[in-house]
Regions:
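Short hydrophobic beta-strand element within catalytic cores of glycosyltransferases
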Residues: 147, 156-159
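Conserved donor-binding/catalytic core segment of Leloir-type glycosyltransferases
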Residues: 14, 54-71, 77-84, 90
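Nucleotide-activated donor-binding/catalytic signature segment of Leloir-type glycosyltransferases, i.e.
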Residues: 101-121
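Membrane-proximal helix-turn-helix segments that form the acceptor-binding/catalytic region
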Residues: 1-12
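Aromatic "clamp/platform" in nucleotide-sugar-dependent glycosyltransferases that forms part
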Residues: 138-139
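Short alpha-helical donor nucleotide-sugar binding micro-motif in glycosyltransferases
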Residues: 125-131
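Helix-loop-beta element that forms the nucleotide-linked donor phosphate-binding surface
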Residues: 9, 20-40
Length: 232
């Protein structure tokens, strides 16, 4: 009911994802302004990250996420374990929660490593840039910052198949709905042959739609329309 109250009692609505905009229109018959979250193409990498975390460039799979059920961590972990992948799977996110501890315990004797929360952007960008694959399991919540930040770092992203993610990545981006879907993708012998092409396409999307200067300009124009009492 909070959603309904907020939508129906707001003078102006901003949707950060096309799928959210469509949802509001279909369910409430109300128009909203689409303005997404922003990101910048990565240019600075942390020289010490590789040594600090003992990672090897291009020799790991990565996820950065809140450890919550809707982010499909178990699905991705189970898919990884059922695949033939031998490189480690690193998960960055706070595991000092009930669900985080459950995951850490469940996968403690595997090649899945929970690194905890990392807040240094250069370190996070270094992980994203050097990851072999980046698995994005978020299934709710519009445009997720972790996804566009991974795209901005030229990570080879594989996304959960839902309207929120699919409206952000390039049209032929790889996606999964089930454990078996993802396991099959991980086992494709030629999967890395698509890395440069798809990563570059997603980076072009960032630079054409999600750069912060573009986002800020959209907000400025929207606020000026509001101040000018123009119909929106």
């Amino acid at each position: 009911w909070l959603e309904k109250f907020g939508v129906r009692n707001s003078n102006y609505l901003v949707a950060d994802n096309i799928a959210i905009q469509e949802y509001i229109k279909i369910n409430y018959g109300i128009n909203s302004e689409f303005i997404a979250y922003g990101a910048e193409e990565v240019s600075d990498l942390s020289r010490n990250t590789i040594e600090k975390y003992l990672i090897e460039k291009g020799e790991f799979i990565l996820t950065i996420a809140r450890l919550e059920p809707e982010n499909n961590l178990e699905l991705m972990c189970d898919a990884y374990l059922s695949s033939n992948s031998e490189i480690p799977y690193y998960i960055i996110g706070n595991y000092q929660t009930k669900y985080g501890q459950l995951l850490k315990s469940k996968y403690k004797d595997t090649n899945i490593h929970f690194l905890g929360a990392i807040f240094n952007k250069e370190e996070l960008d270094t992980f994203r840039f050097y990851a072999n694959l980046y698995l994005h399991g978020h299934s709710v919540g519009g445009t997720n910052p972790a996804l566009i930040e991974a795209m901005a770092a030229k990570a080879f992203v594989i996304v959960h198949n839902n309207p929120f993610n699919k409206s952000v990545v390039c049209e032929d981006n790889l996606s999964f709905s089930t454990k078996d879907d993802l396991s099959e993708i991980l086992d494709r012998p030629n999967i890395l042959s698509k890395r440069e092409e798809l990563s570059q396409k997603n980076l072009e999307i960032i630079n054409s739609k999600y750069r912060w200067d573009i986002i800020i300009e959209k907000y400025e124009k929207y606020f000026l329309k509001i101040l000018g009492n123009k119909k929106i």
